[in-house]
Curated annotation (Swiss-Prot):
InterPro entries: ADH-like_C, ADH-like_N, ADH_Zn_CS, GroES-like_sf, NAD(P)-bd_dom_sf, PKS_ER, SDH-like
CDD domains: sorbitol_DH (cd05285)
Annotated catalysed reactions: xylitol + NAD(+) = D-xylulose + NADH + H(+)
Name of this chain's protein: Probable D-xylulose reductase A
Function: Xylitol dehydrogenase which catalyzes the conversion of xylitol to D-xylulose. Xylose is a major component of hemicelluloses such as xylan. Most fungi utilize D-xylose via three enzymatic reactions, xylose reductase (XR), xylitol dehydrogenase (XDH), and xylulokinase, to form xylulose 5-phosphate, which enters pentose phosphate pathway.
Alphabetically ordered keywords of this record: Carbohydrate metabolism, Metal-binding, NAD, Oxidoreductase, Xylose metabolism, Zinc
Coiled-coil segments: none
Pathway(s) of this molecule: Carbohydrate degradation; L-arabinose degradation via L-arabinitol; D-xylulose 5-phosphate from L-arabinose (fungal route): step 4/5
Source taxonomy: Eukaryota, Fungi, Dikarya, Ascomycota, Pezizomycotina
Length: 358
């Protein structure tokens, strides 16, 4: 794999097959619409989906059939603007929302553009991602960063947008008790957003003690490590140890693990709300009797939608959510493959890949 960046115009980190990646110099993308902008990508976070494509070549129905640039959690600096762009100028620092909907279908017109069937989402086959020197986006999918948000923090607006959408789906209100299963980046950010929304109790659940220790220092009011017992027994212990009475108001699953789903359903109070944010196996066993007899409100959550990125930026700018502490490593662009290996091995919380240096 070549590591030369000295003469590259648009060096890109390209997935060619399972565990097969290369650096490839590609043409600088053209602005195809007068509302487009060209972004010089400065930082990109490594997401679990990127690692999954690298390791397996597919996620569900999305199969990598040809070379694809990885990456979608990015920030950058505006390098060029289209003739109709009014809200941004060259030199502006932006967070990049990496999914472009059709804007015309029923979900788009209803304000749920994250459900658009024609969504062109970065690093989701067949669309290239943002691990390149340059990337083109419509101006309204770039969010200008205030002076008190760094470009490194700007790259975390993507996972924070995911967490914002999940917590909004849960309709978290002040004083509620919220249990978050999975203390990875999205789960931790769900804890932080729930705290910003006024939740009184925020309980992080994970099987890794190191993650729980971080969660307690970060945003959780308490933590819970499940025992190797039934979901009902773990739910009972969760309630008792955290004085939850008949159960929690809200459960968010950011793990996708079947045991977490089961425990989450059982630990909710009657009439509680369950939101599935993590994706695991496409089909699992589900405690439907408990869900029905407790009249639970059960929702899914997918990516982010209208207003989520703006709220994410606002939460960080106001100091209500801290994303800086999640950044545990920054590597140079030519070390991208090694960074993927370290993320796969579970090292750190959020690793960023720096953009190509001029």
């Amino acid at each position: 794999m070549s590591k030369s960046t000295a003469t590259a115009q648009n060096l890109s980190f390209v997935l060619e097959g399972i565990h097969q990646v290369k650096f490839e110099d590609r043409p600088i993308p053209e602005l195809k619409d007068p509302h487009d902008v060209l972004v010089n990508v400065k930082f990109t976070g490594i997401c679990g989906s990127d690692v999954h494509y690298w390791e397996h070549g597919s996620i569900g129905q999305f199969v990598v059939k040809g070379p694809m640039v990885l990456g979608h959690e990015s920030s950058g600096v505006i390098s060029k603007v289209g003739s109709a762009v009014t809200g941004l100028k060259v030199g502006d620092r932006v967070a990049m929302e990496p999914g472009i909907p059709c804007r015309r279908c029923e979900p788009c017109k209803a304000g749920k553009y994250n459900l658009c069937e024609k969504m062109a989402f970065a690093a989701t086959p067949p669309y290239d991602g943002t691990l390149a020197k340059f990337y083109v986006l419509p101006e309204d999918f770039c969010y200008k960063l205030p002076d008190n948000i760094s470009l490194q923090e700007g790259a975390l607006m993507e996972p924070l947008g995911v967490a914002v959408h999940i917590v909004k789906q849960a309709s978290v209100t002040p004083g509620q008790s919220v249990i978050v299963f999975g203390a990875g980046p999205v789960g931790l950010l769900c804890c932080a957003v729930a705290k910003a929304f006024g939740a009184a109790k925020i309980i992080a659940v994970d099987i890794q003690k190191a993650r729980l220790d971080f969660a307690k220092k970060y945003a959780a009011t308490s933590t819970f490590e499940p025992a190797k017992v039934s979901a009902v027994d773990n739910a009972d212990r969760l309630r008792k140890e955290n004085n939850l009475g008949v159960g929690a108001d809200v459960v968010i699953d950011a793990s996708g693990a079947e045991p977490s789903v089961h425990t989450g359903i059982h630990v909710l109070r009657p009439g509680g709300t369950y939101v599935q944010g993590g994706m695991g196996r496409s089909e699992i066993m589900f405690p439907i009797m408990a869900a029905c007899t407790k009249e639970l409100a059960i929702k899914g959550s997918f990516r982010y939608g209208s207003g989520d990125y703006n709220l994410a930026v606002g939460l960080v700018a106001s100091g209500k959510v801290n994303v800086k502490d999640l950044i545990t490593g920054v590597v140079e662009f030519h070390d991208a493959e090694q960074a993927f290996k370290e993320v796969k091995a579970g090292k750190g919380i959020k690793t960023l890949i720096a953009g190509i240096q001029d």
